[in-house]
Amino acid sequence: MIRHLLKVCGIKGKVLVCLALLSFLGGLAAAPALAQTAADQQVLPGTPAGSAPPEEKKETAPSTAGPMITDTAVPIDTGHVSLSVLSALSCYPGFFNSNWRTVTAGGNFYTFYMPVKVTYGPAKNTEVYLIAPFIDYWGNNVSIPGPNGQRSASYAGIGDLTLMGKYNLLPEGDVMPAVSAVAGFASIPTGHASHLNPGLLGVDAIGTGALTFTTGVNLFKWVKPFLLYSNIWINSPVNIYQNNSENVVSREYITFNLAAEYPLTPKFVALLEFYSNWTWSNIYTPQGYQTPETLLGIMPGLEFLATEKLSFEAGASLDLAGKNGVKKYTPMLTASYSF
C-alpha cells in the first residue's frame, strides 16, 4: 500500500508519507511517558507512593507549677530532682468546738511554717519525696497564764518529717484520669511533742508525736482548659510517748483534697484548692482518746512560671468549717526549682 502511494504521489508524496509515519511512531513512544507523569501527579511531594498520611500529634496539657496543698498524680521524670521551699504565716482567730462553731482562741497565736521539700524520680513512673519543716510558734495576751504568770511565749524547731512514695498505675487517657498509688509516712515524730513546759503555754508542741502511715490514690485529668487534681488518703497514726511503754493507736482520718488550675497566659496560672480532713474512731481507739478533728477549707492562689525550671506560687488558705480543732488563716508563698 505504501509503494502504491509513493508511485501515485511522486517525490513530494514520498516526503509527506515518511513524515506521517514518523509522527505516528513518535506518538506511540511518548504515550507511556505521559501516562507515567499523570500518575506521578497523584502522589504528594516528599511522600513515598503507597504510604499512609502522617498522624496528628496528640495535644498535651500546658505546663504549670502544680497545686500548693494537693499532691500531684504524675511522677517527676526519671533521674530528675526538684526542690521546693514554702513560707507560710498562720494566725488563729479561734477554735472549732464540737458543734462546728468558732470560739475564742484564748489569746493571740501565730505560726511561721517553712517546709523544704525534695522530690526525686528513682525509676520510671516512680517518685519519692521528703519534707522537713521549720516551725516557729508563738503567742501573746494569753487568757490563762503560766505557772509564773507568763502570758506570752515562743518556741522554734524542726517539726515532723514526711516521707512518701508514689507510683503511676494508669496514664491519663481520653476519658480516664491518671491514677497514682501513694504510700508512706505523713508524719515521722521528729517534732517536739512530749514533756511540754507549762511556762511555754503550749507553744512548744510543734510535733504530733505520732508515726502516721498513709496510703491512698492521687488523680489527675486535663479537661480543657482546666487541670484537675484529687487526693484520697487514709491516715493511720500511732502515738509514741517516751513516758508510755506501749504505743497508742490514734484516731484514723481521711484526707480529701481537690484542686483546679486555669492557665491565664503561658506564664500565669490561676489556682483554686479545697482541702479537708475527716476523723472517726475504730474498735482499737480508746474511748475519749484524742477528740476527733475535722477540717474543711479553700485556698485561692496564683502561679508564675518564671522559666522552664523556676516557678513561684502565692495563695492563702482559709479554714471555713471544722470540729474540735484550730481555725487559722494562712498566706503562703512557694518557690520551686527543677534540676
Model-identified regions with their sequence ranges:
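Outer-membrane pore/translocation modules
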Residues: 136-245
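Surface-exposed strand-loop-strand hairpins of Gram-negative outer-membrane beta-barrel proteins
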Residues: 53-58, 88-113, 203
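Outer membrane beta-barrel transmembrane domains
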Residues: 94-96, 247-339
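Detector for outer-membrane/organellar transmembrane beta-barrel domains
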Residues: 78-86, 201-284, 337
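Transmembrane beta-barrel strands of outer-membrane/channel proteins
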Residues: 85-91, 130-134, 182-188, 230-236, ...
